[in-house]
A protein has these predicted regions:
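Conserved acidic donor-binding segment of nucleotide-sugar-dependent glycosyltransferases
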Residues: 340-349, 357-362
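Nucleotide-activated donor-binding/catalytic signature segment of Leloir-type glycosyltransferases, i.e.
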Residues: 269-287
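A conserved catalytic-core segment of Leloir-type glycosyltransferases
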Residues: 28, 35-103
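Short hydrophobic beta-strand element within catalytic cores of glycosyltransferases
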Residues: 324-327
């Protein structure tokens, strides 16, 4: 089966979890027998990828302006930046030309998120192949529960209504699509994200020199809490800071690591000062490779405080590195994990209570770590690929009957 996969990023040229999810999903689909052409909107090569053909749609270098997650910034102006729109339009023109060659014509078109939906619709019109839109996040998610950018809503609506099938990364995301875009429920299938434990096995060797001061705090009995995310309103980080401040009043031996960057960075730094917790909160910036590994490894507890998180792959990564998990109920990953503590994102009292519990009860912390570490290994991309391939075959079969 030949799949034309339309995406916006692949590691290492990625700004978030979308590229990671697309990479491992495509790898698992290729292993299941799919022949994939993956089209990216930038000029950087992916010569290390041998399980699919990566096609460069433009001569633009990968840049932060391609970030699909900055819609909150765009929404302030109620328009898309000229940079990102020009990349989109160039991407669409490339797809038109690419499909002129019969050998490039697919059996299935698989478009990831709003940035590639217009290209997906055009590819469907040219080839007659079924279009599957894979929703990793809606504009309502990206705007932190607000309305967001009307241009993006329009693209999402057209993409969803013109698709033969819609994959949503969680029940939570499916419910948002049903509520906001009023589509037939039978059109939407929940396809969870996953993790490939073997992909993390090669980076297990922790280097205790990376976070020496945090190591020192741990020798003094501190519990280390961390989150790894983009600093945007969607992620609920101000709620996390408020809860951490409340918890640390009762248990001063707590430290918080914030890994990532984004438009809220300065606001969050000011918030820590306002709450009087600056000496306990550590901003690392965006991390990759060994420093990324070490941030997970030094931590005891991982918090996902999102206002609305379609899935949340970082929670599975944290479980791999032996963290207990505290996850907002508004995060999709909470639908597939049992051995975690849950709370509503706005309930800072509940989150503070959870933080106190895990930081003062070694047995609870140990049990949560052990439970979720066993559990996360069953959530694999190979299982998700089987589900997707089965659905692709079903869609093909339905198309032949028409």
């Amino acid at each position: 089966m030949k799949i034309l996969m339309l995406g916006w990023e692949l590691p290492p040229h990625n700004s978030g979890g979308l590229g990671v999810a697309c990479f491992y999903m495509a790898k698992a689909l290729a292993k299941a027998g799919a022949d994939i052409d993956f089209v990216v909107p930038y000029s950087e090569k992916h010569d290390d990828i041998n399980f699919m053909k990566v096609v460069n749609a433009t001569d633009f270098p990968f840049s932060s302006y391609m970030n699909p997650y900055n819609s909150f910034t765009f929404s302030k102006h109620h328009t898309l930046t000229s940079d990102i729109r020009s990349v989109q339009l160039s991407y669409i023109e490339f797809i038109k030309k690419y499909l002129e060659d019969p050998k490039n014509r697919p059996d299935i078109i698989h478009a990831h998120d709003w940035l590639t939906m217009e290209a997906g619709i055009i590819a469907k019109n040219i080839t007659g192949a079924p279009l599957i839109s894979h929703i990793h996040a809606t504009e309502f998610d990206r705007s932190g529960g607000g309305y967001g950018n009307p241009q993006v809503h329009d693209i999402e609506y057209k993409g969803i209504t013109n698709s033969d099938k819609v994959f949503a990364v969680s029940k939570n995301t499916k419910d948002i699509i049903l509520k906001e875009y009023k589509v037939d429920e039978s059109k939407i299938e929940v396809v969870y994200n996953a993790i490939e434990p073997s992909s993390l096995a090669t980076i297990n060797d922790y280097d205790d020199r990376t976070f020496r001061y945090i190591e020192y705090l741990k020798t003094k009995g501190y519990t280390v809490v961390m989150t790894l995310t983009r600093f945007t309103v969607q992620k609920g980080l101000t709620y996390l800071l408020e809860a951490f401040a409340r918890a640390s009043q009762k248990n001063p031996k707590m430290a918080l690591i914030l890994v990532g960057d984004g438009e809220q960075r300065n606001e969050l730094i000011e918030k820590t000062a306002e709450l009087g917790i600056s000496e306990k909160v550590f901003f690392t910036g965006f991390l990759r490779g060994e420093r990324w590994r070490d941030a997970y490894s030094i931590s005891d507890v991982f918090v996902m405080s999102s206002v609305n998180e379609p899935f949340g792959l970082t929670a599975l990564e944290a479980a791999h590195f032996n963290n207990a998990l505290i996850i907002s109920k508004q995060s999709g990953v909470s639908e597939v994990l049992k051995n975690i503590l849950r709370y509503d994102f706005w309930d800072t009292h509940k989150l503070a209570s959870h933080l106190l519990a895990v930081s003062t009860s070694p047995s609870l912390l140990r049990d949560l770590k052990r439970g979720v570490k066993k559990e996360y290994t069953t959530i694999t991309w190979s299982k998700i690929a089987e589900q997707i391939m089965h659905k692709f075959l079903s869609i093909q079969s339905e198309g032949r009957k028409k």
